[in-house]
Structure formats: structure tokens, C-alpha cells
From Swiss-Prot:
Name of the protein: Arginine deiminase
Pathway assignment: Amino-acid degradation; L-arginine degradation via ADI pathway; carbamoyl phosphate from L-arginine: step 1/2
Cellular compartment(s): Cytoplasm
Family: Belongs to the arginine deiminase family.
Organism of derivation: Staphylococcus aureus (strain JH9)
Length: 411
């Protein structure tokens, strides 16, 4: 089969094309009173966050990676006036809780904007002062203090989550939290309408109308045969089973097994990739809490049973044994965050020490602040490329969270 614009058959194959989102004005629309609702713990300093992100992108380019930007692709996808109108309608339809009946006033504002300005405005949010209509509904008098008609989308620079490249297809995800639910609208329009993608017949393994939640940070492509997916607060068992069935029934898909790994439902264990990432053929970074749970984990291996013409599910409690079995590797190495130290490990886990981006086998991008983890990776033969992330990390995501591979070389 001829390669299309999406091909990801591993976590470690040489990264050739990646999707990023440069932090924008949405970060400056974060205010302390509404941080929890927008899933932030702190407010990044935009100017520094942009410099850090620009350096991240430049590091990838220097390693031979083509960098695409979500905001640019989205604007290029709505050149057709009818598509632009449908895009606006879809965004507003998912913002009714805050719009309070002022769709027409917001559309009037949007009509004054270019396509790029429109996308940027939707991402950054619409303040009430930009519309400034008179209160016409009781709910507006009651909710007068809330400053937005359209919430900002500060999590967008974590492009890993609203979508996931799997094989030559993609999942367009239904996000768990309302604050992030609109994010996958952008990739939906990009895949359907952008010249680079629209005629490529890209399989949509799951779309954003799926009734079950799934997020890309829980979706790991371990090999052309094996997916690992976290069962987490943000990714449901129902979504994983639906994805497995869709992939198994597609004759062009190569995947034979889906490994579902249950992780705790807490912010520290937000997604599977915050506690567990593949960095070489036989090496994984690992949060020490996962290592301590070895032998008591809930792991499920989903396969297609040709005899019964249905999926079959096996259970395991040992992650190391499971990975060695499904990947056909004799001795997998787990490299603990912060060397497993009770203090260093907890601190570096909070700063996404396990959330490494592998750009080819044995070569990773990490935050420089996680020096204990980085030194240990080097001792294990891994080449570590460090980036600064003092502001970026305030969003609780690392290099893997901030990137969506679109194309990797096969291994």
C-alpha cells in the first residue's frame, strides 16, 4: 500500500512529520478563579512559553522532522465559505453553555476576521467585552461575573490528546472534560477539508461523535502489531473495545493485539504516557508507582478470535511479562523516573519526567529540569536532547504531550 499523509506504526520509528500548536493568547485568558475549569494549575508566561515552544520545534527540525502547526492547517481547511460557515456553527454548537443565546453577535464578530484570525480567536476565546450586548436573559444577570462567551482553549498546545495517529489512520477523540471537548473539531476539519489530507482516504478509527471518551495520551503504538491503551479517568474501556473492533475488522490494518492497561484516576496519572513511554526497542520510561504495582495490575490483552469471529480478552497482572510476550522481546528494561527515589521521582514525575518524545530508536526529547531522569537515561545508552520548559510544564505535559506524530518511518 502506498504511504499516505499519516503513517505511525511504532512509538520509536524515525519521526518525519509532527503536528504542533504554538501557545497563543489563550494562555493570557487564564485567570486564577477559573483555572480548575480549564484544567490548569498555574498561569504560564506566554512570551517565555512561546520561546520554549519555538525552541522545541527548532530542535525537531534540526533532527529532520517536518513541523506542521494545527492553527495554520485549520485556517487552510476553511477556505471554502460553506466549510467556514459549518465550522463556525460546529464551534458555537459546543459552546452553548457560555454563549447564552448570543450566537448572532458572535457570528458578526467572526465575519470581520480572516480565516487565520478566526481560528486564533476561537482558540484564544471570546471575552464578553468584545461583544458587549445588553443583558437580555435572566441567566446573564445571574452569571454576569463570568468573563467569556467562548472559553479559551489553553490545553491546545498538547496536540497529543484530541487525536491519535494509528497505522495509516487516526482517532478523532471525544475528550473527557468539557473544557477540552471542542479541541478535536480542528483535526476533524483538517482531515476532511485540507488539501494535504482530504483525498487520502484516511481511515477514521473513531470519530468525535463516539459516545465514549478517549484521549491520545492514552494511545501508544508499540509496534505494527500491538497497541497499548490506558484505561484512565479520561479514556474508557468502552472506547478501547470499540477501537479494537474497528481496527480488527479493517483488512488494511496490521494490528493484532490491543493491550489495555488500567492506571489510577488522578491528575498525577493523567494519561498512560505520563507514566510510561517507549524510547527504544526494549526500553521504557516508567513512573516508580507503576513499578511498585507490578504483579497487581489490571492488564487486558484484546485479540480477534478467528474461530468465534469475535474479540477474545485475556487478563494479566504483570506489565513486564505482558510487554515481553506481545512484543516478542526477551528482556524489557524499565527506567524509573527520578531513579525511583521517593523525592526525586515524585518531583520529576510532576514535571513530566516520564513523558519523553522518541524521535528515533534510542533518541528522546525531554525537559532539562528532570536531570535525575535524564542522567539515568544516558547511563542506559539513550541519547537525550534537552529543552527548557519552565513555563510549558505549568500545563502538566511534556514533549510527548506537546506533539502528535503524523508520519514515522517503519522499524
Amino acid at each position: 500500500m502506498t504511504d499516505g499523509p499519516i503513517k505511525v506504526n511504532s512509538e520509536i520509528g524515525a519521526l518525519k512529520t509532527v503536528l504542533l500548536k504554538r501557545p497563543g493568547k489563550e494562555l493570557e485568558n487564564l485567570v486564577p478563579d477559573y483555572l480548575d475549569g480549564l484544567l490548569f494549575d498555574d498561569i504560564p508566561y506566554l512570551e517565555v512559553a512561546q520561546k520554549e515552544h519555538d525552541h522545541f520545534a527548532q530542535v525537531l527540525r534540526e533532527e529532520g522532522v517536518e513541523v506542521l502547526y494545527l492553527e495554520k492547517l485549520a485556517a487552510e481547511s476553511i477556505e471554502n465559505p460553506q466549510v467556514r460557515s459549518e465550522f463556525i456553527d460546529d464551534v458555537l454548537a459546543e459552546s452553548k453553555k457560555t454563549i447564552l443565546g448570543h450566537e448572532e453577535e458572535i457570528k458578526t464578530l467572526f465575519a470581520t476576521l480572516s480565516n487565520q484570525e478566526l481560528v486564533d480567536k476561537i482558540m484564544s476565546g471570546v471575552r464578553k467585552e468584545e461583544i458587549n450586548p445588553k443583558c437580555t436573559h435572566l441567566v446573564e444577570y445571574m452569571d454576569d461575573k463570568y468573563p467569556f462567551y467562548l472559553d479559551p482553549m489553553p490545553n491546545l498546545y498538547f496536540t497529543r490528546d484530541p487525536q491519535a495517529s494509528i497505522g495509516h489512520g487516526i482517532t478523532i477523540n471525544r475528550m473527557f472534560w468539557r473544557a477540552r471537548r471542542r479541541e478535536s473539531i480542528f483535526i476533524q476539519y483538517i482531515v476532511k477539508h485540507h488539501p494535504r489530507f482530504k483525498d487520502a482516504n484516511i481511515p477514521i478509527w473513531l470519530d468525535r461523535d463516539c459516545p465514549f471518551n478517549i484521549e491520545g495520551g492514552d494511545e501508544l503504538v508499540l509496534s505494527k502489531d500491538v497497541l497499548a491503551i490506558g484505561v484512565s479517568e479520561r479514556t474508557s474501556a468502552q472506547a478501547i473495545e470499540k477501537l479494537a473492533r474497528r481496527i480488527f475488522e479493517n483488512p488494511q490494518a496490521t494490528f493484532k493485539k490491543v493491550v489495555a492497561i488500567e492506571i489510577p484516576t488522578s491528575r498525577t496519572f493523567m494519561h498512560l504516557d505520563t507514566v510510561f513511554t517507549m524510547i527504544d526497542y526494549d526500553k521504557f520510561t516508567m513512573h516508580s508507582a507503576i513499578l511498585k504495582a507490578e504483579g497487581n495490575m489490571n492488564i487486558f490483552i484484546i485479540e480477534y478470535d478467528d474461530v468465534n469471529k469475535d474479540i477474545a480478552i485475556k487478563q494479566s497482572s504483570h506489565l513486564k511479562d505482558t510487554l515481553e510476550d506481545v512484543l516478542g522481546i526477551d528482556d524489557i528494561q524499565f527506567i524509573p523516573t527520578g531513579n525511583g527515589d521517593v523525592i526525586d521521582g515524585a518531583r520529576e514525575q510532576w514535571n513530566d519526567g516520564s513523558n519523553t518524545l522518541c524521535i528515533r530508536p534510542g533518541v528522546v526529547v525531554t525537559y532539562d529540569r528532570n536531570y535525575v531522569s535524564n542522567d539515568l537515561l544516558r547511563q542506559k545508552g539513550i541519547k537525550v536532547i534537552e529543552i527548557s520548559g519552565s513555563e510549558l510544564v505549568r500545563g502538566r505535559g511534556g514533549p510527548r504531550c506537546m506533539s502528535q506524530p503524523l508520519f514515522r518511518e517503519d522499524i
